[in-house]
Amino acid sequence: MSRICQITGKGPMVGNNVSHANNKTKRRFLPNLRTVRITLEDGTTRKVRVAASTLRTLKKQSSK
């Protein structure tokens, strides 16, 4: 399984670890993925891997 949000396509980013001596080494920032059940328009449910920020947006949109 890849570390990609199945709704927004948000994936890992690349950056640097920076030490106190300002030495830089590469690192990856991974999305905060959660597995949730989502009910589709036709009434069926599916398990999807969603970023936490996307889940927050979905909850906000569904409450309106």
Curated annotation (Swiss-Prot):
Keywords: Ribonucleoprotein, Ribosomal protein. SUPFAM superfamilies: L28p-like (SSF143800). It comes from the Bacteria. The keyword Mitochondrion does not apply. GO terms for cellular component: ribonucleoprotein complex; ribosome. One of its GO terms (molecular function) is structural constituent of ribosome. GO terms for biological process: translation. Gene3D superfamilies: 2.20.150.30, Ribosomal protein L28/L24. InterPro entries: Bacterial_rp_bL28, Ribosomal_bL28, Ribosomal_bL28/bL31-like_sf, Ribosomal_bL28_bact-type, Ribosomal_bL28_sf. It holds the Pfam family Ribosomal_L28. Belongs to the bacterial ribosomal protein bL28 family. NCBIfam families: L28. This is Large ribosomal subunit protein bL28.
